[in-house]
Amino acid sequence: SKSYQEGAVPLMMTHGWPGSIQEFLKIIPILREQSKVPLDIICPSLPGFGFSDKPTEIGMDSENIAKIQHELMTALGYKKYVVQGGDWGSTVSKWMAELFPENCIGIHLNLVIAFPPSGDNPMEGVTADELKMLENYEKYKSQGFGYFEIQKTKPQTIGYGLNDSPIGLAAWISEKFYGWFEGSDNK
């Protein structure tokens, strides 16, 4: 979504799994209307997601995808840009900022993986709200993370099974969305 305005800030937004660029369609007009600066918004599909082809080479990890997306920004004529990512998009965006600090002038992540500092008491200073979030994360790891282990260890098995069943694929993905979001406002 190009603004065609002088001084527009290029913003690359990268989705995660099981998402696609579709998750950005409603936010693009809001960003345009509420931003204090004009934005050129670029939302590429991760390789193998949405309408993009599957990777043809082994090793298509977040770091390599970041290199490809940087090449895309360069090919589009952007020397400096800002990135945003969630889920897998956050790891790609992090790599873009790390690998291309002269080009990536800003980063926003809505999934940040961080670990407590080492020390005698890593929980020192953790608030009650933060403890509740940690409890929720532990519940998620024990009850909602099985899909990740299956996809990580046996991707071909689940891939073949879901490829032959549109209902199975829809159930596999929609179950994640319903489990991850609460409330009627999250539609």
Region locations from a protein language model:
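Conserved small-domain helix->loop->beta segment predominantly found in fold-type I
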Residues: 187
